[in-house]
């Protein structure tokens, strides 16, 4: 009889009807026989009905509001006609938190699909299940199954039944019993309980693998019907029936493969791009038409196996060489296939390789093949069967609601389904299945025996028989499991005909004979294999970890082994020899899946799509997150479901609402990890987008959120189900926004680009709350705030609000065509236009500038040829997209107004500001003077030092007892402020000590103190520096001459911040070392406002501020101590808040010193930089704005602002950069001088240039962009000699010496051809100063608006940024160039010809106008560059410096000039009449240059630098310790270590009793160090190695923090080359120099070339990078771990100096290659140089965009010389056009690349 069905939607019981069955009887004895295992059973009859029935076990739940099904009575049960195909009944909602149903299910506890028999217990852990016969209206044969044994019993009614049941009826009836209401397969409420999901991506015969997530993973489906599809025999894979013909592979004479017969559109091009690249050839192949598998033998001896049918394609590679290739010439090879093996024949013999079986292909494609050729897979908890007729996947009829975890193939060839703790054989119509509590893994042997691993802490192995029908009669055997003496836990199990294999969580292998189950010992005790089953001569575990097992087609067990590169390989376990056989790489594989017919959500609508700038596109469809895949150019499901709402934050991140909880989405570009090995890539290497559910947003407690609007994860607005609206920010408690003005309840919230909050209410109203109102934490602002109505778009009702592209507010019109999206721009509603998918503001500008420039790659080199055109002094004329001439003239030359020329105004302002300072910094200057006055008053007051125990810290501690619990907050805040002031006073004094005595020009890096605050090593240069500092103070008339050291000592004595008083101790030490300090006068004379020459004036003022505030804190303590008991302390709390947040927190000196400024000069430079760009963006006719509009194609400033925002948001890599520069200056040159009697030379030349430059650079940082605003003073001086000779007429016609033509009026036309050469030496120097800061992503829009509006002063702009650092840099260049010129010209003198009879002793002056053409070539013979850079604030310091030697032949420039000149000459007297022979007179000539020049240049430069950052050491926190412990626990998986880690993490541990929080942290850290003290860093386990390294470095920093030392954050040595081929090849000069010097370490190019030789993937990537349009290649080295340990040791004891570190970083033996990068910089430069003689003016601006074209990042483990693998990112990692086309064609056919 049939169980009742449950209606899909209502949950009501549907009672089936009963009809008589008149089928003939069959003998039950025949059905009791064991069926043959290799037989195929069609699901169209008995099997299908049985599958549909037993499939009830795995039905997906419905919503929990459905009522439980009531078991029907016998009279209501009817049997359907045998020919009918009864629909599968529905399940009631299963209570699983991981179901695919409505969100209400997400918190329900999962239950098993089977329940224990109440009267039986199973010691084995396997639960016994029975299905009892039900009453029937006639005497039918009744069969009872005792599950999972499946024991058959005859019902008493069978003997006298007139109509015994057929086999089909017996099975169908039995399976119906499985799902009857009183069956033990039911839940307690009469409904079937569904199951938890396991990881579907790694199927194995065990049903699980190591590393399976404990969390929810989509379940799988059951059972299939017999289709008309084709079937392949297991060994030779010949097609049996109904197959679409498959292509074959051909090799040409050169070994190049031809895939043209693969007729699926897009497939042949895809295979060509992966398997037939120019360098790929093959030695042999085996391929036949209509055969499922094809084989290719690679040139390196590895075998490729290509398996294709119309449901999937897979290409995998053998793990080891199938044929060992020796020598350069490979042998002649022939391949022959026989069953499941491939034979490789050479002259030296035959080698045989086993081909991958069904389980191998299923492992990577998730498509399983049954006995009769049916293909099945699980997708989104549902079973699908492939229909070869329609080439689509279909859910078998009646199984639409049946859920499974996964499918796998057993050693007997059957397909098994696992669901929670149950395993069912899907290949048998009898459906044998078994359940064991807490099932972890299972495996089925060829003889149908199954091993089931259960339990986590206490584990057991159950051995049972899975044979259909009679398997239940076989006794089960259970053994407890003990691995490695109880130290290890089992994770996976594999069973063969003779052996049991087990893998533990550490990846080690165990084995035992199956006979071990025959003994009486209740436990199976095993030790890991050491001598047997080794890989590369090493036991498994460590680098090579067993993660699971699968079965070959012969039933043998194959171990899945993950290597250190993260690749999984299958290796057959040879039980005879106890060895691993050569296997197959299952990770680096090409996989295509046909996804037609699989349930997929539709693409998200426009309203549900978010363009997240650099992060890509995401969307929401049917409650599921979708991501845009750029390869096939379509939407793909991200696997995140049950999402209620998706919204964009102002920070360009996505946030989701799920089940009333607010989460961030983690969206980032994903670049595949590639193993460093000798094989090419089969898997997709193009970048994709990775989407993961992030952490729940903090601060919402247990509230159920129903609407929200996000600025960032720290600042947002949330509305809960109680209609409570709250505003959240990082530094304040949540503020309830109970603000009037709304009508109705809020339905949705959203922000506009200004962060104004908009709300849509239930009444259809739209309202706005200004940013200032909802972000304010002041009560007064909230009381004044009010919601204001906003006009609806067109007066139409709004359905929902969104924040879409560019953070613009959008609204969806209700019931409008085309979804009716509108956006609010500039207060007006406009139709919403979706941003194009591939639009990228940064790439667009980069491409525009690149297309405008004229550059070419020189063939067979890595060099770039560049063309430049200059016309009438204007450069950049060659560009196709440049500013109009009128705009250029107004910006750089002349503005037709009465306004003072900009360059003159800038020069005047600069002189004034250097003298008086900046008006906008007046408050800072005044505060400095006031602080020094207050410090003097403390000094002069002469107060007594406090008695012992009366320091500030002790007094605050004493308040705890006085104030009690109600004063705890006040006491804590007092101590926090005191500690901050004391620590910072120490930091400020240490900063002074580090700079005092430093001689920058002498490269003296340390002052009295080194970077750690310890005394630096004394040196002559330091002593000289101290004397200079002392002398400078004495000569400085702005200095007060006071003894600041004495004033500070007196103040610290009086204030006494603590008993230790470390600042006073440090001050005493510095004084003893010769520190002499004064401070500026309170009133600076001559109107100068401040002392700009004081090196650390702001540091002194900040030190004074700290001490003055400590004095005020002491006065406040006096008031607190005088409080009577039970007094109100709120007034004092307000005073403390005012002191902390206003008096101290908003003090201008604190504000600017927190930005990293230590002196007024640096502050003014940063201020000036910001001011310059505020003016640049505000004025549309400024050179910067004009040039940017030309570069970006913007029509006006508003459009330019939008594009600049987009550019900043699209900065993706840390190496991407946007640069702006404004420059102006003056050039001086000497006239053309001819010495007396030196007509052909040598002639001296000289020149000088002075420039003022302003620079803005932007690059990506974590959570925002980093901006550099820098001012630069640059100058150069050049000098040289030239020579030349006039060759006309003699050069052309020696017999006709006439060289001039009389044109009358005493004027002469003189033609001339001249050749000349010159050598010039140039010395250039520059100094930069400025500020570096970060702008968070959410503030980019507002920051750019502030720049363009220009309403704020620079200090206000700086206050809006975060993480400021001061910037200072110096650069020195020396260049030696040689040039040659060929000049053909003609000139007419403007003055009369000199009279031959003129006085020979008189000077003569003449003028001439010339016109002509000149060709020139210039070669840079030698260049030397050195520079230093410092960025710092009081928490961090970055140092950068050049490490260059003189380099030769760096640049060649050749070109031509067409010019007109007006020149004047002075000729010195010779004393000889002109008519008489005599010496050539000396002359000086000056001329302008009007005309045009065309130049071509090639640059071949190499620059080296070191760069390192030190941070002030921080003590480890509780969160840091938890993260550290977690990492150690994940690396060390043995039970002993896990237990000890858990003990240390227990807060109730006795070792923490009575300790303060900081002491508890120290005790736990000590415990971790003790635990791992005796464990050396393992060389065979990278994860453990890294975990121990993290522990070691954390302990070093924690100890260093106690001494206030700094620790290294990162360090690098970089080599940059404009010749891209320099990445992998050395120049001839470098090779010569390397041969004559002792080079103990190979050069970078040699290392890279060796890497390329070892890895063809890497070689191909580097060749692509070298062949790109890149303009710069860079090799980055980083310290090896051994060097890091030395540096950490020096940081810990305070002896490591910057010079020491710099020297260490130059030792290549201690460095490893970290990164290889190729950039392309596109520059839009427009400059003007006035064509005037002797003195000229220059003005210009440029925009540059640097894009990372290719970047290879290496990853290292315990081996510091050989990388584990690498990633490839940058623009070249994006899918190519050909890949997109192939993937798009395949997508149309239903095939998608598996990523």
Curated annotation (Swiss-Prot):
Residues 129-154 have a biased composition (Basic and acidic residues). It comes from the Bacteria. Changing residue 829 to A: Defective in the virulence activity. Residues 1-227, 1461-1488 are annotated as: Disordered. A motif (ERMRS) lies at residues 1787-1790. Residues 1-18, 97-109, 117-127, 174-191 have a biased composition (Polar residues). It is found in: Secreted; Host cell; Host cell membrane. In P.syringae, AvrE is functionally redundant to another effector protein, HopM1. Mutation of either avrE or hopM1 alone does not strongly affect P.syringae strain DC3000 virulence, but the avrE-hopM1 double mutant is severely impaired in virulence. Belongs to the AvrE family. In planta interaction assays, interacts with the A.thaliana protein phosphatase 2A (PP2A) via direct interaction/association with specific B' regulatory subunits. This is Type III effector AvrE. The lineage of its organism: Bacteria, Pseudomonadati, Pseudomonadota, Gammaproteobacteria, Pseudomonadales. The gene is avrE.
């Amino acid at each position: 009889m049939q169980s009742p069905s449950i209606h899909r939607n209502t949950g009501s019981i549907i009672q089936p009807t009963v009809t008589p069955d008149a089928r003939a009887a069959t003998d039950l004895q025949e059905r009791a026989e064991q069926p043959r295992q290799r037989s195929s059973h069609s699901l169209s009859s008995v099997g299908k009905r049985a599958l549909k029935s037993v499939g009830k076990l795995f039905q997906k739940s419905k919503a929990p509001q459905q009522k439980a099904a009531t078991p029907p009575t016998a009279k209501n049960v009817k049997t359907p006609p045998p020919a009918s195909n009864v629909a599968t009944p529905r399940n009631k909602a299963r209570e699983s938190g991981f179901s695919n149903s409505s969100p209400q299910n997400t918190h329900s506890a999962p239950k098993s699909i089977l329940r224990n028999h109440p009267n039986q217990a199973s010691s084995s852990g396997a639960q016994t299940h029975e299905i009892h016969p039900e009453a029937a209206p006639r005497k039918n044969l009744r069969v009872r199954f005792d599950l999972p044994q499946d024991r058959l019993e005859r019902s008493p009614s069978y003997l006298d039944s007139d109509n015994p049941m057929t086999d089909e009826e017996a099975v169908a009836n039995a399976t119906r019993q499985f799902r009857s209401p009183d069956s033990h397969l039911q839940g307690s409420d009469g409904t079937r309980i569904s199951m938890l999901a396991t990881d579907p991506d790694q199927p194995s015969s065990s049903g699980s693998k190591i590393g399976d997530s404990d969390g929810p993973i989509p379940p799988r489906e059951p059972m299939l019907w017999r289709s008309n599809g084709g079937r392949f025999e297991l060994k030779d894979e010949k097609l049996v029936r109904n197959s679409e013909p498959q292509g074959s592979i051909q090799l040409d004479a050169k070994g190049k493969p031809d895939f043209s017969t693969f007729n699926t559109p897009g497939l042949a091009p895809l295979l060509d791009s992966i398997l037939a690249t120019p360098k790929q050839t093959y030695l042999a192949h085996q391929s036949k038409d209509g055969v499922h598998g094809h084989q290719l033998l690679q040139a390196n001896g590895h075998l490729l196996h290509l398996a294709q049918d119309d449901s999937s394609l897979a290409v995998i590679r053998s793990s080891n060489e199938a044929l060992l290739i020796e020598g350069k010439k490979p042998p002649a090879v022939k391949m022959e296939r026989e069953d499941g093996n491939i034979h490789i024949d050479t002259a030296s013999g035959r080698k045989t390789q086993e081909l991958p079986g069904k389980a191998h292909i299923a492992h990577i494609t998730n498509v399983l093949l049954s006995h009769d050729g049916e293909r099945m897979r699980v997708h989104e908890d549902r079973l699908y069967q492939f229909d070869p007729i329609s080439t689509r996947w279909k859910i078998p009829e009646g199984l639409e609601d049946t859920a499974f975890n996964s499918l796998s193939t057993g050693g007997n060839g059957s397909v098994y389904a696992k669901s929670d703790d149950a395993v069912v054989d899907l290949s048998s119509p009898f459906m044998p299945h078994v359940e064991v509590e807490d099932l972890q893994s299972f495996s089925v042997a060829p003889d149908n025996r199954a091993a089931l691993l259960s339990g986590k802490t206490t584990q057991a192995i159950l051995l049972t028989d899975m044979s259909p029908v009679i398997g239940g009669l076989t006794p089960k055997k259970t053994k407890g499991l003990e691995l490695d003496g109880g130290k290890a836990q089992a994770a996976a199990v594999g069973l063969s005909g003779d052996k049991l294999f087990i893998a533990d969580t550490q990846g080690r292998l165990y084995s035992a004979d199956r006979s071990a189950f025959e003994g009486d010992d209740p436990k199976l005790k095993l030790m890991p294999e050491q001598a047997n089953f080794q890989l590369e001569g090493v036991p498994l575990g460590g680098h090579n970890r067993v993660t699971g097992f699968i079965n070959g087609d012969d039933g043998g067990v194959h171990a899945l082994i993950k290597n250190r590169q993260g690749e999984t390989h299958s290796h057959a376990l040879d039980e005879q020899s106890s060895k691993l056989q050569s296997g197959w790489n299952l990770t680096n594989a090409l996989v295509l899946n046909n996804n037609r017919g699989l349930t997929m959500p539709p693409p998200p609508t426009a309203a549900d799509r978010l363009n997240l700038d650099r992060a890509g596109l995401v969307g929401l469809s049917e409650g599921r997150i979708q991501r845009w895949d750029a390869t096939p150019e379509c939407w793909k499901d991200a696997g995140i479901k049950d999402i209620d709402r998706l919204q964009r934050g102002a920070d360009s991140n996505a946030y989701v609402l799920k089940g009333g909880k607010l989460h961030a989405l983690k969206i980032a570009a994903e670049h595949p990890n590639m193993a460093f090995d000798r094989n090419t890539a089969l898997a997709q290497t193009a970048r994709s987008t990775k989407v993961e559910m992030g952490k729940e947003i903090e601060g919402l407690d247990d509230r159920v959120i129903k609407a929200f609007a996000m600025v960032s994860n720290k600042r947002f607005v949330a509305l809960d189900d109680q209609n409570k609206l709250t505003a959240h920010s990082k530094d304040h408690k949540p503020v309830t926004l109970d603000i009037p003005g709304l009508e109705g309840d809020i339905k949705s919230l959203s922000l506009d680009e200004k962060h104004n909050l908009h709300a849509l209410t239930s009444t259809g109203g739209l309202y706005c709350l200004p940013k200032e109102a909802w972000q304010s934490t002041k009560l007064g602002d909230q009381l004044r705030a009010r919601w204001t109505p906003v006009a609806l778009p067109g007066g139409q009702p709004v359905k929902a609000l969104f924040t879409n592209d560019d953070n613009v507010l959008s609204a969806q019109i209700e019931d409008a065509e085309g979804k009716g999206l509108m956006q609010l721009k500039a207060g007006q509603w406009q139709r919403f236009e979706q941003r194009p998918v591939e639009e990228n503001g940064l790439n667009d500008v980069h491409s525009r500038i690149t297309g405008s420039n004229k550059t070419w790659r020189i063939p067979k080199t890595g060099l770039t040829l560049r063309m430049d055109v200059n016309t009438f002094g204007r450069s950049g004329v060659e560009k196709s997209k440049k500013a109009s001439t009128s705009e250029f003239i107004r910006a750089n030359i002349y503005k037709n107004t009465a306004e003072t020329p900009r360059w003159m105004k800038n020069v005047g302002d600069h002189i004034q500001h250097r003298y008086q300072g900046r008006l906008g910094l007046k408050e800072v200057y005044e505060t400095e003077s006031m602080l020094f006055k207050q410090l003097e008053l403390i000094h002069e007051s002469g107060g007594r030092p406090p008695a012992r125990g009366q320091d500030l810290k002790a007094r605050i501690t004493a308040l705890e007892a006085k104030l009690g619990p109600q004063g705890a907050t006040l006491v804590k805040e007092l101590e926090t402020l005191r500690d901050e002031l004391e620590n910072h006073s120490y930091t400020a004094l240490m900063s002074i000590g580090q700079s005092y005595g430093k001689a920058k020009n002498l490269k003296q890096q340390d002052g009295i103190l080194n970077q750690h605050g310890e005394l630096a090593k004394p040196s002559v240069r330091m002593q000289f520096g101290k004397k200079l500092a002392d002398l400078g103070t004495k000569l400085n008339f702005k200095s007060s001459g006071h003894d600041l050291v004495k004033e500070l000592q007196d103040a610290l004595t009086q204030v006494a911040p603590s008993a230790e008083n470390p600042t006073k101790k440090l001050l005493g030490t510095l004084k003893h070392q010769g520190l002499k300090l004064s401070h500026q006068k309170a009133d600076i004379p001559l109107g100068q406002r401040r002392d700009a020459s004081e090196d650390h004036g702001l540091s002194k003022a900040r030190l004074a501020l700290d001490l003055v505030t400590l004095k005020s804190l002491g006065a406040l303590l006096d008031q607190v101590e005088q409080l009577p008991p039970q007094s109100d302390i709120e007034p004092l709390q307000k005073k403390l808040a005012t002191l902390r947040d206003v008096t101290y927190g908003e003090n201008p000196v604190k504000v600017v010193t927190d930005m990293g400024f230590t002196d007024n000069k640096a502050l003014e430079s940063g201020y000036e930089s910001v001011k310059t760009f505020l003016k640049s963006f505000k004025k549309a006719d400024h050179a910067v704005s004009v040039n940017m509009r030309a570069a970006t194609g913007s029509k006006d400033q508003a459009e330019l602002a939008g594009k600049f925002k987009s550019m900043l948001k699209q900065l993706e890599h840390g190496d991407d950069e946007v640069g702006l520069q404004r420059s102006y200056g003056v050039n001086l040159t000497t006239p053309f001088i001819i010495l007396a009697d030196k007509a052909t030379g040598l002639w001296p030349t000289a020149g000088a240039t002075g420039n003022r430059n302003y620079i803005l650079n932007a690059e990506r940082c974590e959570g925002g962009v980093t901006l550099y605003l820098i001012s630069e003073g640059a100058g150069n001086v050049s000098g040289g000699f030239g020579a030349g000779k006039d060759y006309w007429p003699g050069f052309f016609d020696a017999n006709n010496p006439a060289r001039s033509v009389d044109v009358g009026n005493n004027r002469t036309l003189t033609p001339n051809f001249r050749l000349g050469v010159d050598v010039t030496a140039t010395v250039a120097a520059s100094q930069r100063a400025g500020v570096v800061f970060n702008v968070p992503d959410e503030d980019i829009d507002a920051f750019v608006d502030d720049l363009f509006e220009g309403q704020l002063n620079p200090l206000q702009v700086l206050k809006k940024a975060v993480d400021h650092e001061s910037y200072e840099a110096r650069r020195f260049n020396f260049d030696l160039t040689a040039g040659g010129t060929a000049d053909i010209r003609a000139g007419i003198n403007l003055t009369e010809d000199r009279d031959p009879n003129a006085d020979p002793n008189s000077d003569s002056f003449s003028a001439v106008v010339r016109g002509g053409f000149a060709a020139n070539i210039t070669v840079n013979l030698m260049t030397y560059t050195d520079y230093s850079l410092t960025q710092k604030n009081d928490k961090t310091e970055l140092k950068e410096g050049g490490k260059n030697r003189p380099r030769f032949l760096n640049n060649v420039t050749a070109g031509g000039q067409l010019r007109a000149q007006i020149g004047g000459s002075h000729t010195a007297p010779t004393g000889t009449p002109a008519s008489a022979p005599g010496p050539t007179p000396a002359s000086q000539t000056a001329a302008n240059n009007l005309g045009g020049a065309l130049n071509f240049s090639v640059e071949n430069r190499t620059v080296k630098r070191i760069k390192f950052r030190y941070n002030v050491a921080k003590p480890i926190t509780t969160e840091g310790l938890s993260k550290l412990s977690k990492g150690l626990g994940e690396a060390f998986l043995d039970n002993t270590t896990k237990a000890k880690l858990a003990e240390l993490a227990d807060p109730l541990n006795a070792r923490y009793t009575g300790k303060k929080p900081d002491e508890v942290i120290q005790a736990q850290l000590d415990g971790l160090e003790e635990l791992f003290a005796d464990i050396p860093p393992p060389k065979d386990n990278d994860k453990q190695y890294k975990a121990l390294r993290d522990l070691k470095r954390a302990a070093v920093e924690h100890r260093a923090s106690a001494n206030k030392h700094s620790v290294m954050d990162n360090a690098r040595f970089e080599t940059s080359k404009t010749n891209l081929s320099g990445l992998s090849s050395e120049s001839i000069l470098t090779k010569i120099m390397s041969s004559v010097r002792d080079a103990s370490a190979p050069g970078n190019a040699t290392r890279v070339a060796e890497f390329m030789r070892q890895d063809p993937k890497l070689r191909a990537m580097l060749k692509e990078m070298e062949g790109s349009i890149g303009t710069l290649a860079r090799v980055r080295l980083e310290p090896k771990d051994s060097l890091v340990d030395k540096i950490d040791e020096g940081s810990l004891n305070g002896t490591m100096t910057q010079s020491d570190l710099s020297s260490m970083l130059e030792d290549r033996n201690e460095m490893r290659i970290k990164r290889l990068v190729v950039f392309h910089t596109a520059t839009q430069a427009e400059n003007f140089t006035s064509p005037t003689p002797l003195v000229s003016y220059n003005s210009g601006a440029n925009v540059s965009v640097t894009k990372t074209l290719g970047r290879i990042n290496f990853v290292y483990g315990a081996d510091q010389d050989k990388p584990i693998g690498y990633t490839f990112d940058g623009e070249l990692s994006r899918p190519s056009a050909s890949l997109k086309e192939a993937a798009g064609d395949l997508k149309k056919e239903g095939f998608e690349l598996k990523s």
